[in-house]
Design a protein with these regions (language model features):
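Class II aminoacyl-tRNA synthetase catalytic cores and aaRS-like
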Residues: 1-215
Length: 215
């Protein structure tokens, strides 16, 4: 079958199972770790949004290739799925590993030493976490909170829609209406010297909707 050149990967790092043994696959992810066992054997943990997959380098050339790649670099790995000799029951992909035939660095991480270990980012200083937020969000625990929030919001929205509620989005820029708090002003591009403000509450917009008959 001819390869689709527009497809960056055939599977995610969390999708391969024992039933995929023998398949030729292509994964894209961040190199979480490389453990060198010998000159012709090494293990890579490849991670993306969906999980991790073990890559096993079985020759000197491939071991040298992975040794030259910094942690958290974005790489593409093409190879064959095989059954692991020692399985990891804690991982959904723990029954398999990939024997790579081709490795391509898509984006090299410029840090030889990361500002913090990805899986322990919550222990880092808050200012450092915010500065390198894109690394912090690769932490599964942090990422899963975003996923949970998305599911909760979706469930609430569905429940409200099932009760015939209608979702309305009110403007995020309006005329300034100073109250107790200071307005956050945004200059008007077409009207020099005038400003929009972030609304402190959607009260007026909701009242307009009620007068319009939307109850």
């Amino acid at each position: 079958e001819e390869e689709n050149m527009t497809q960056s990967r055939t599977h995610t790092c969390g999708s391969l199972r024992i039933t995929d043994v023998g398949k030729q696959v292509k994964l894209v992810g961040w190199m979480e770790n490389f453990r060198e066992v010998g000159s012709n054997l090494g293990f890579v943990v490849l991670r993306d949004f969906y999980g991790t997959t073990q890559i096993v380098a079985t020759d000197e050339e491939m071991v040298a290739t992975f040794k030259g790649i910094t942690k958290e670099s974005t790489i593409s790995v093409s190879g064959e799925v095989r059954e692991r000799s020692s399985k990891n029951d804690k991982l959904e992909t723990g029954d398999i590993e990939i024997v790579p035939m081709q490795v391509e660095v898509l984006g090299k991480c410029r840090f030889r030493e990361l500002p913090f270990e990805i899986n322990r980012s919550k222990e880092a200083d808050e200012a450092i976490r915010l500065k390198y937020r894109y690394l912090d969000l690769r932490n599964a625990e942090v990422k899963n909170r975003l996923i949970l929030r998305s599911k909760v919001v979706a469930a609430l929205r569905k429940a409200m829609m099932d009760h015939d509620f209608m979702e309305i989005t009110t403007p995020i820029l309006t005329a300034s209406s100073p109250e107790g708090a200071r307005d956050y002003l945004v200059p008007a591009r077409k009207h020099p010297g005038q400003f929009y403000a972030l609304p402190q509450a959607p009260q007026q917009f909701k009242q307009l909707l009620m007068v319009s008959g939307i109850d």
